[in-house]
Amino acid sequence: MPVAVVTDSTAYLPAELSGTYDLTVVPLTVVINGTNGLEGLEIQPAEVALALRARRAAVSTSRPAPSQFTEAYQRLLDAGFDGIVSVHLSAKLSGTFEAATMAAAELGDRVRVVDSGTTAMGLGFAALAAATTAGRGEDLESVRAEAADHASRVSTLFYVDTLEFLRRGGRIGAAQALLGTALSVKPILHVVDGAIVVRDKVRTAGRALAKLVDLAVEASGDGEVDIAVHHMEAPDRATALADAVSMRLGDRLRDCYITEIGAVVAAHVGPGASGVVVHRRP
C-alpha cells in the first residue's frame, strides 16, 4: 500500500477539503478551568472565545501524548501502509513535533516526521501536498520531501486585537507584547523560522487589515499562489480580507479558502484575530 499522511488538528483544513484527502488527524488538547477537551472533537472555538472574554477563566493548550501518535501510526501500519509521513505545527510553538518524533522512534524508519515551521493552513498546505503525492503512489522519501518543500513555500501573517493572549501562553516574549500594547498600537505578526514575531505596528484595526493585505501580496512573489484566510469570530472581516487580496492578485490566485481557526490557536490569539496564509506554488 502507499504512504499514509498524518497531521495534527491545528492544520485547520477547510471543510470542502477535509473529506477529499486521505489524512489522519491527531488532535491537540485545550484546557479550560482544568477541564480537558480534544480540539475539534470535544471543544470548539466558540467555547474558547467565551472563556477568554470571561477573563477569570484559565485557558491553556497541550500537545498530544506520544502514545496518541504511537496508536495512530500503528493503526496505519497494521492496515498495510508501507510508511508514514507525519507533518506538524512548528516545534517552536508546541511540543507536538517532539511527541510525534518520540512515537516515530519506536517504529524505526517507517515514519518520517516533518516540522512545518508554522501552523494553520501554513501546515495545512504542506499536509495536503504530502497527501497528494502519497495518492500518486510515491515512496516515503518523496512524500516527506514534498511536505517539507511546500512548508517552505508558505508565509503566515496575522492580526490580533491584543498580544496579551500570546504572551500568557508563552508564544511571544514580554518585550514584544509590551510593544504591541504601547499607545494602543495594533500589531501584525508573522511566523519566522518557526517563531511568532511582530512584523509591523499600526494605529488602528482598519490600517492593520490594510497592511495585512499589502504584506500578503508582497509575500506572494510573482508566480501563482493559493491563499487561506483565517479568523476567530470575524467572518465578515475574513471575507473582506479575502476579497481584497483576491482583487490585488488577480489571475495569479488559484485557490482561496476562508476558514475559522480552531480552539488551540484561538486560545492564543483571542477573539477578533484574522490571518492570511500565502502558499506559493512550485
Q: Where does each model-flagged region fall?
A:
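Short beta->alpha junction loops
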Residues: 63-64, 115-117
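N-terminal glycine-rich phosphate/adenylate-binding segment common to multiple enzyme folds
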Residues: 68-100, 104
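Mixed-charge interfacial surface used for oligomerization/domain docking
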Residues: 4, 10-20, 24, 28-31, ...
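N-terminal short beta-loop-beta anion/metal-coordinating cradle
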Residues: 20-47, 62-69
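Glycine-rich oxoanion-binding loops at beta->alpha junctions
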Residues: 51-77
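Short catalytic-loop micro-motif centered on adjacent basic/acidic residues
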Residues: 60, 86, 113, 228-229
